C-alpha cells in the first residue's frame, strides 16, 4: 500500500493526503478544480486550517504529494468528496451521492487486483456497497474482471480548527464489506493514527458517523429550544443553563443562531431519509435547529428601524474558521438584506463575501461596522470579537446569539 490516490482535496481530503505523504506514502491528490491543483502543487493551500500550510508544504517538497485533475493507478483509492442533500419542493431532503458516484466511476478503469478502496465521505447507510456496484459497472463496460478488490468505509471525525491534531489522536472506525477489507484499512490508517482503530462492517461504520452527528444535533436542539422558551418567558437563557449545569448529571450545551457546517446540519437527514417513521426525534431536532435563524431574523427586524444599518459579526458556521458551508449566519444575513436592511458583514476569516451575499451585504472591518450600525448582531464568537464589551456598544441595540458579550 505504498501509493495512494485521494479523490477530493477539500477540508478532509487535503489533510489526509498530506499526512500520508509526510509518512512516506506516494500520494496523488485529485480535484476537479484546476485552481486547487495548481495551488497545492505550488505548496500552498486554498482553505484555512491551523498549520495545514506547513504540512502541505512539507508533503509537496518531499516529492510524495502531487495533485492532478485526473486519477492514476494506485494501491489505495480514497474518496473524500462532498455528500450534500437535495431539498425537494415539499421540503424533504434526500442524499446527493453524485460526487461519490462520479469519483468512483473515474478511477474504476484503473483498479487492479488487491486494490483497497476507501470511502471517507460521510454517507448514508449502504453507500460503500454502491461504490462497489459503480466500480463493477465500469469494469463490466470494459469487459474487465478484477478479483480481490477490497472496500471499506473509514469516516473522518475531525473538527475544523483542530484537524491536524484530531486526525492523529482521534479513534477511528474501519468498516469493511469484508473483514479482510476492514483489516487492510486499519493497517493503512495505523500509518499515522496513534489512537485506537476499531473494526466493524461497512454499514455499521456508516451509521456510526451519522449517529455521532445526530446525537450532537439533538443536544444542540434542546439548548436552542430552551432559548426560544426563555425569550418568551423573559428569562436569561445563559444564566439558566449555567445554573442547571450545576446539577452533577446535567450538561446542557450552549444555544446559538442555528447549526451549520457540512456534518451536523446535513448528516441527520441521511438517517431521516433512510428511516422516516422511526427517526422522529432526529427529524424534530433538525427542524428546531433549522428554524432558529428565522427567530434571530425576527429579533433583528423588531430591533432595527426601517432600512436601518445592522452589523452582523461572523459568517462562518463556527468560531475561528473560514468554512461557510450551511452557515446559519449566512442565511440570517441573506434574510435581513432581503427585508430591506443595510447589512454590514464582519468576517475576519474571509476576503470576499460568498456568492449568495454579493451585492446584498457589505464586507467591512469590525471598527467600520461598529461606527455605522444601529443594531449589532453577534452570530459567531470568533476570537477577533472576544474583546467586545457592552460599554463599547453603548447606544446600540445588541442581539447576542452566543451569550459572549458581557
Please give the residue ranges for each predicted region.
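Structural/interface elements that position substrates and couple domains in central-metabolism enzymes
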Residues: 1-406
Amino acid at each position: 500500500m505504498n501509493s495512494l490516490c485521494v479523490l477530493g482535496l477539500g477540508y478532509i481530503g487535503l489533510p489526509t493526503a498530506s499526512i500520508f505523504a509526510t509518512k512516506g506514502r506516494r500520494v496523488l491528490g485529485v480535484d476537479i478544480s484546476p485552481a486547487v491543483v495548481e495551488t497545492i502543487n505550488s505548496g500552498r493551500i486554498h482553505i484555512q486550517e491551523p498549520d495545514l500550510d506547513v504540512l502541505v508544504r512539507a508533503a509537496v517538497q518531499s516529492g510524495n504529494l502531487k495533485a492532478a485533475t485526473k486519477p492514476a493507478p494506485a494501491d489505495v483509492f480514497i474518496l473524500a468528496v462532498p455528500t450534500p442533500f437535495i431539498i425537494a419542493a415539499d421540503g424533504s431532503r434526500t442524499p446527493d451521492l453524485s460526487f461519490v458516484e462520479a469519483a468512483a466511476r473515474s478511477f474504476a478503469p484503473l483498479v487492479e487486483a488487491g486494490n483497497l478502496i476507501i470511502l471517507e465521505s460521510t454517507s448514508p447507510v449502504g453507500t460503500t456497497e454502491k461504490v462497489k456496484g459503480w466500480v463493477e459497472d465500469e469494469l463490466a463496460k470494459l469487459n474487465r474482471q478484477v478479483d480481490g478488490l477490497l472496500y471499506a468505509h473509514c469516516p473522518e471525525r475531525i473538527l475544523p480548527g483542530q484537524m491536524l491534531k484530531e486526525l492523529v489522536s482521534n479513534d477511528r472506525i474501519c468498516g469493511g464489506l469484508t473483514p479482510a477489507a476492514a483489516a487492510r484499512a486499519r493497517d493503512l490508517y495505523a500509518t499515522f493514527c496513534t489512537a485506537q482503530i476499531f473494526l466493524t462492517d461497512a454499514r455499521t461504520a456508516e451509521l456510526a458517523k451519522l449517529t455521532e452527528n445526530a446525537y450532537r444535533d439533538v443536544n444542540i436542539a434542546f439548548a436552542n429550544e430552551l432559548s426560544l422558551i426563555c425569550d418568551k418567558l423573559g428569562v436569561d437563557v445563559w444564566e439558566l443553563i449555567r445554573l442547571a449545569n450545576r446539577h452533577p448529571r446535567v450538561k446542557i450545551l450552549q444555544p446559538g443562531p442555528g447549526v451549520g457546517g457540512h456534518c451536523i446540519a446535513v448528516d441527520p437527514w441521511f438517517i431521516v431519509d433512510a428511516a422516516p417513521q422511526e427517526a422522529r426525534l432526529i427529524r424534530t431536532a433538525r427542524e428546531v435547529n433549522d428554524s432558529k435563524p428565522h427567530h434571530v431574523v425576527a429579533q433583528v427586524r423588531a430591533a432595527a428601524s426601517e432600512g436601518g444599518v445592522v452589523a452582523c459579526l461572523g459568517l462562518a458556521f463556527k468560531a475561528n474558521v473560514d468554512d461557510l458551508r450551511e452557515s446559519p449566519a449566512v442565511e440570517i444575513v441573506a434574510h435581513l438584506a432581503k427585508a430591506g436592511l443595510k447589512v454590514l458583514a464582519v468576517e475576519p476569516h474571509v476576503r470576499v463575501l460568498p456568492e449568495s451575499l454579493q451585492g446584498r451585504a457589505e464586507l467591512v472591518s469590525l471598527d467600520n461596522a461598529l461606527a455605522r450600525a444601529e443594531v449589532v448582531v453577534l452570530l459567531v464568537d470568533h476570537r477577533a470579537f472576544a474583546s467586545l464589551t457592552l460599554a463599547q456598544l453603548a447606544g446600540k441595540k445588541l442581539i447576542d446569539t452566543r451569550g459572549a458579550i458581557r
